[in-house]
């Protein structure tokens, strides 16, 4: 007698999940509006300011790479190619919102108020680079991949408990979604309806590991399903799409509707970091050329020029401003006194415990000689 075997619809279930996360786009690669209904309400001046910040950030990246090669900066993770994901997402925030960045997300915290020279000091490992000025709602860049997701969930819950109309936004890359902290963070925020925005900048490679070898999920946005929170996949080279998605997520959050996971499809044009990574060993020239055609600055420039809002002269002005301010910032970083062991001890507590007081005195005597 034959036994009838029930066929569970496993494959169909997965297909249905992935189908719920099509890529959200407003501007195509030619800078043309393909989703008029989703166009955000931004004035002409706001559109120009967004472009200024993206151009400035590209120049900052180029100069930071040069300074690193000269030995004037330490650790640095290039950002070119991710300006729409980073700058347009920040553009949707308010001053009272908190940013919990990863190590590639220094541009967002600079635009949120961290002085540029302190960002350079952070790169050098100077303690003052992590001393955030009063009123600037950012945390120092997180080096441990994914850990910022747990911290963002906690900050967001704190904002909720205090009745603040503000959000905590955090960023990681595609590799970060393979970390346990990622799942703990989105699950915790979902369970407590914490006002958090989780941005996954899917730049296709976790250092050298392609996203296809990190997960069999067809999108990273669908990882939100397990936590029971909304998720969306966005064209991360389209600044208007990124802005619109983050703006909507922020509105949800401050209205008590909980967190959102946003996957931005983007590409880093440079190496993972300046610490010896060679992307030509794991990326083809064809792939790099394909993503170069999607450049967020080129795309947005075409859009603004078609509206008569941007010119070569205006862009050159931003470039010169950026170069001058970077020059001043690195000079200020150079003039900052070198850190001493006593500096590192003294900033740990408001009042030092006895064992650190003892160590402080020992090093103070050594440093005075």
Curated annotation (Swiss-Prot):
PANTHER family: 2-OXOISOVALERATE DEHYDROGENASE SUBUNIT ALPHA, MITOCHONDRIAL. It comes from Geobacillus stearothermophilus. GO terms for molecular function: pyruvate dehydrogenase (acetyl-transferring) activity. This is Pyruvate dehydrogenase E1 component subunit alpha. Signal peptide: none annotated. Pfam families: E1_dh. The gene is pdhA. GO terms for biological process: branched-chain amino acid catabolic process. CDD domains: TPP_E1_PDC_ADC_BCADC. The pyruvate dehydrogenase complex catalyzes the overall conversion of pyruvate to acetyl-CoA and CO(2). It contains multiple copies of three enzymatic components: pyruvate dehydrogenase (E1), dihydrolipoamide acetyltransferase (E2) and lipoamide dehydrogenase (E3). The keyword tRNA-binding does not apply. It catalyses: N(6)-[(R)-lipoyl]-L-lysyl-[protein] + pyruvate + H(+) = N(6)-[(R)-S(8)-acetyldihydrolipoyl]-L-lysyl-[protein] + CO2. Keywords: Oxidoreductase, Pyruvate, Thiamine pyrophosphate. NCBIfam families: PDH_E1_alph_x (TIGR03181). Its EC number is 1.2.4.1. Disulfide bonds: none annotated. Its cofactor is thiamine diphosphate. Heterodimer of an alpha and a beta chain.
